[in-house]
Curated annotation (Swiss-Prot):
Function: Mating type proteins are sequence specific DNA-binding proteins that act as master switches in yeast differentiation by controlling gene expression in a cell type-specific fashion. Transcriptional corepressor that acts in conjunction with ALPHA2 to repress transcription of haploid-specific genes and of MATALPHA1.
Organism: Nakaseomyces delphensis (Yeast)
Family: Belongs to the MATA1 family.
GO cellular component, one term: nucleus
Name the UniProt record assigns to this protein: Mating-type protein A1
Length: 122
């Protein structure tokens, strides 16, 4: 790695960290973060190392944060859950449309709900 590449990495870190408040978790997906790193003229291994380093430094992971589901939607999901704790793919898609969520969000919500119920019974 030459001096210019190290300077580019330093600048990338400053750019990424300037978007955080008091070194807190980034609340938006890491798109900006990846965009800056991908624009650097360094080898893929160095990009991945930089991605991990900055991620650890700012407390983020390379995935999107969970979304908050409003009370009305939670109530609807809870009603469905009371009837049936495991949904088929078709049922999951139907519930997702009704709740304005993705089928994946519904699947994860149901999985988390089952775990929460299991833990409260213990």
């Amino acid at each position: 790695m030459n001096v210019q590449e190290i300077h580019n990495i330093r600048e990338a870190c400053i750019t990424i960290l300037s978007g955080t408040k008091h070194n807190s978790v980034l609340f938006e997906p890491c798109d900006k973060f990846d965009e800056v790193i991908n624009s650097l003229d360094i080898d893929p291994d160095s990009k991945e190392t930089l991605r991990r380093s900055v991620s650890l430094l700012v407390g983020t992971r390379n995935h999107k944060r969970g979304c908050n589901i409003d009370k009305k939607t939670k109530d609807m999901l809870n009603k469905v859950y009371e009837q049936k704790q495991y949904l088929t793919k078709e049922e999951r898609e139907f519930v997702a449309k009704k709740c304005n969520l993705t089928p994946l969000q519904v699947r994860v919500w149901f999985a988390n709900k089952r775990i929460r119920n299991k833990n409260t019974k213990m």
